[in-house]
């Protein structure tokens, strides 16, 4: 074996795993609240289709389609504003075929522990502006 073992990296990984295990419930609750807030704001934007059932248990992921708009171009515009999303089929073409989004794909938002409620509002506001342009 060549080189030096990355002990600081191993220690950092251990500390991160330890933190997440200790606060898993709080992290999940916070991330789900962010997604609920984002979905509420997205529902206010005409033409946005949210790909989930209301009232069902969810992960902290929200996917949308906007008929008549290129998801990749919208994702690029959001990225230019430092809003990280993923556009496409998300390695799930069979699900997209079932949803009727196989041709368009979707835009996926996955807020995390270090995101804020204000960022959810800002994200929806920017998306609304992009769709009006």
Protein language model regions, located:
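Conserved beta-strand segments that form the floor/walls of ligand-binding pockets within enzyme
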Residues: 12, 65, 84, 108-110
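Structural signature of PLP-dependent enzymes
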Residues: 1-10, 14-39, 51-58
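Buried hydrophobic packing segments
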Residues: 13-16, 95, 123
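Conserved PLP-binding catalytic core of the aspartate aminotransferase-like
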Residues: 32, 48-93, 97-99
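Acidic-histidine catalytic/liganding microenvironments
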Residues: 42-46
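Glycine- and other small-residue-rich loops at beta-strand/loop junctions that grip anionic moieties
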Residues: 2, 63, 112
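PLP-dependent enzyme catalytic core of the Aspartate aminotransferase-like
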Residues: 97-133
